């Protein structure tokens, strides 16, 4: 069986080159061809000797997930549904802005954490994605977007930021996610800054500590509630890793973080977590931690049981936080007409936790 070179970071490619009798510098050449150029055909790698190209073709492949569908929203947001085999699909979303282009990447087929307000969590969990399936999302998107991208003010390439906020909990797929992060940061591959790569977690504390040691990038924490009683309901992993312990892990993470703050994400649910009293409680909870609050309007999906907070409720909540001196933003809703907004990604998941096939709408249109 051929080896998929998308599964390897620089260290892995160096080891592979040694196994086929090649010197370490060949790994750097391969990294540049595969990731910087987006080349999947060994014959097109013109600075590699013919003999090496033949060895590569005999032993290896460059095989990202296959694109099932590609939809663009009215606001320019683009969503790909990618096949990862056995009837499963994952979703990747590109959000263009004037000064940056952000790619939202999935880390699992489904998610086992079952957050109450998240479409992905409702579909159950099938498996972790491989490195090739994680980095392959960036590979595909970079290739597709580069074909039509023109230099814009403030950026010279289509993808400037990565957020691991797609399907799945990244920190329960730790090794594959970290290897993918290494590729994102590698100057011979994508060359992104640690400050521009963000991992979002629901609060897997041991893995947060490991990430701080192994590959500290920007961190976002899905908080969504100002106390344990409510967070236990909305984010069930809180029963294992309660808020006070989570905040302690955040403080430890800041010792190595590329940014001097943690982002706390807070989805706004009408009548659930959006009162002024809850805003004040949230202030008391996080005021001693260098942080930014990101308020996220809830994005509806069928049978969610939740409603989006009104604009007035969001404004009142934000004002309480800002008056207390907390940096607070309200996330713009992007791509909701193609189900690409936060909390809507669901792909196509064969749930192995409940053994029930779930076919989710791929996209509108």
From Swiss-Prot:
Cofactor binding description: Binds 1 [4Fe-4S] cluster. The cluster is coordinated with 3 cysteines and an exchangeable S-adenosyl-L-methionine.
Positions that bind S-adenosyl-L-methionine: 168-169, 200, 222-224, 299
A GO cellular component entry from the record: cytoplasm
MF terms (GO), sorted A to Z: 4 iron, 4 sulfur cluster binding; metal ion binding; rRNA (adenine(2503)-C2-)-methyltransferase activity; rRNA binding; tRNA (adenine(37)-C2)-methyltransferase activity; tRNA binding
Compartmental location: Cytoplasm
InterPro entries linked: Aldolase_TIM, Methyltransferase_A, RlmN_N, RNA_MTrfase_RlmN, rRNA_lsu_MTrfase_RlmN/Cfr, rSAM
Record-annotated Radical SAM core domain positions: 97-337
Cysteine disulfide links: 104-342
Active site residues of this protein: 91, 342
Reactions accelerated catalytically: adenosine(2503) in 23S rRNA + 2 reduced [2Fe-2S]-[ferredoxin] + 2 S-adenosyl-L-methionine = 2-methyladenosine(2503) in 23S rRNA + 5'-deoxyadenosine + L-methionine + 2 oxidized [2Fe-2S]-[ferredoxin] + S-adenosyl-L-homocysteine; adenosine(37) in tRNA + 2 reduced [2Fe-2S]-[ferredoxin] + 2 S-adenosyl-L-methionine = 2-methyladenosine(37) in tRNA + 5'-deoxyadenosine + L-methionine + 2 oxidized [2Fe-2S]-[ferredoxin] + S-adenosyl-L-homocysteine
EC number(s) stated in the UniProt entry for this protein: 2.1.1.192
GO terms (BP aspect): rRNA base methylation; tRNA methylation
Binding-site residues, [4Fe-4S] cluster: 111, 115, 118
Enzyme class (EC, first level): transferase
Function per UniProt: Specifically methylates position 2 of adenine 2503 in 23S rRNA and position 2 of adenine 37 in tRNAs. m2A2503 modification seems to play a crucial role in the proofreading step occurring at the peptidyl transferase center and thus would serve to optimize ribosomal fidelity.
Note: Reaction proceeds by a ping-pong mechanism involving intermediate methylation of a conserved cysteine residue.
Protein's recorded name: Dual-specificity RNA methyltransferase RlmN
Species whose genome carries this gene: Nitrosospira multiformis (strain ATCC 25196 / NCIMB 11849 / C 71)
Record gene name: rlmN
